[in-house]
């Protein structure tokens, strides 16, 4: 697991998006004190990542 800080939002669970040449799919979400954190599946490497808009 690692964190990617980026600028995007408005994704629902199940939505896919492209970031740094990889396709991600949002599989869960929760609101933290300092912002919104999404858990995603990174298809190309088949690993979970935390994606945190800043």
Language-model features, listed with the residues they occupy:
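Basic/aromatic-rich interaction segments and small domains that mediate binding to polyanionic partners
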Residues: 18-45
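Intrinsic disorder/low-complexity segments, especially N-terminal tails and targeting/processing regions
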Residues: 6, 20, 51-53
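Intrinsically disordered, low-complexity, charged/polar segments
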Residues: 1, 40-54
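Mixed-charge, Lys/Arg-rich low-complexity intrinsically disordered regions
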Residues: 1-12
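Intrinsic disorder/low-complexity signature
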Residues: 12, 28-31, 51
